[in-house]
Amino acid sequence: MAFIQEIKRRMNTVKSTIKITNAMKMVSRAKFIKFKKQFQEISLFFNEFYKAVGQVVVSLKEPKKKPDNQKTLWIMMSSSLGLCGQHNSNMNKLLKANFKADDKIFFLGRKNQSFWNKNSQYNPAVGFIDIQDRDINFDYCQTIFDQIMDAFKEFKLDRICMVYTKFKNSLIQQSQLFQVFPFDVETFKTLNPVVTDQQLDFEPDQATIINLITPQFFDVALYGGLVETKLCESASRQNAMEAATKNAKDLLDKYTLQFNKLRQNSITEEIIEVIGGMN
């Protein structure tokens, strides 16, 4: 009888878990729809903007040769909440594979900062902003840009790269690296294959144009990366909670079957005892 009560207690616990994971799945679904709409609204502008900037970048005369020992400021876009599958760990794996001892990291989101604080011997963190969903807009990204550039100048780094998650579909998201500064020709050719090596005439001059578009490009890339990463986070959490709910339901079915068998055996034993007493 005691074991039957224990099984019943476990069943109640699993039922409570199902309610929680199912509620979290629905919340994640609502956020997914919100960020997908936002992402779709800005995608056309971003593609055309990257194409225009890319056409300018590939027209640069005599691009500077990249030194082999470039020191990088990594902008790590992670979540501030957990329970989102491999969303954060995949970005950590990608950055670990490309991180060098002199590199620094500016964290946008709390989760991956705690990972690097615990697992890195280099103390790479130079900035942290706990991004909330309601904060993600173009104006806010401009204030983030100022803080990132302050860190970039203070530590005398050579380039800035984003670590974000690219959205393929609701089931597939892929961690990506994207060089934001200085402009990289190959990056733009990868982003948009139609970008060509056609030479352009610049007015007033090439350097002035580059100086004008650099902060604008940074803001656009930052905003786009945050929106897309939040979209991927929502999709990943939705999938994780759906899997957790399914696993909990499977476990509940197992406990229910076990409970029914024990109850049946208990009732059978009681009937046998009653019949035996009558005899």
UniProtKB/Swiss-Prot annotation:
Q: Where in the cell is it found?
A: Cell membrane
Q: Which GO terms describe its cellular component?
A: plasma membrane; proton-transporting ATP synthase complex
Is Ligase found in the keyword set?
Answer: no
Residue ranges of the TM segments: none
InterPro entries given for it? ATP_synth_F1_ATPase_gsu, ATP_synth_F1_gsu
Instruction: Say if the entry is tagged with keyword Membrane.
Output: yes
A GO molecular function assigned to this protein is: ATP binding
Q: Which GO terms describe its biological process?
A: proton motive force-driven ATP synthesis; proton motive force-driven plasma membrane ATP synthesis
A Pfam family (short name) is ATP-synt
Query: What kind of membrane protein is this, topologically?
Result: Peripheral membrane protein
Q: Which SUPFAM superfamilies match?
A: ATP synthase (F1-ATPase), gamma subunit (SSF52943)
Q: Which UniProt keywords apply?
A: ATP synthesis, Cell membrane, CF(1), Hydrogen ion transport, Ion transport, Membrane, Transport
> What is stated as this protein's family in its record?
Belongs to the ATPase gamma chain family.
Quaternary structure per UniProt?
Answer: F-type ATPases have 2 components, CF(1) - the catalytic core - and CF(0) - the membrane proton channel. CF(1) has five subunits: alpha(3), beta(3), gamma(1), delta(1), epsilon(1). CF(0) has three main subunits: a, b and c.
Instruction: Give the function comment from the record.
Output: Produces ATP from ADP in the presence of a proton gradient across the membrane. The gamma chain is believed to be important in regulating ATPase activity and the flow of protons through the CF(0) complex.
UniProt cross-references to PANTHER family, sorted A to Z: ATP SYNTHASE GAMMA CHAIN (PTHR11693), ATP SYNTHASE SUBUNIT GAMMA, MITOCHONDRIAL (PTHR11693:SF22)
Instruction: Please state what the protein is called.
Output: ATP synthase gamma chain
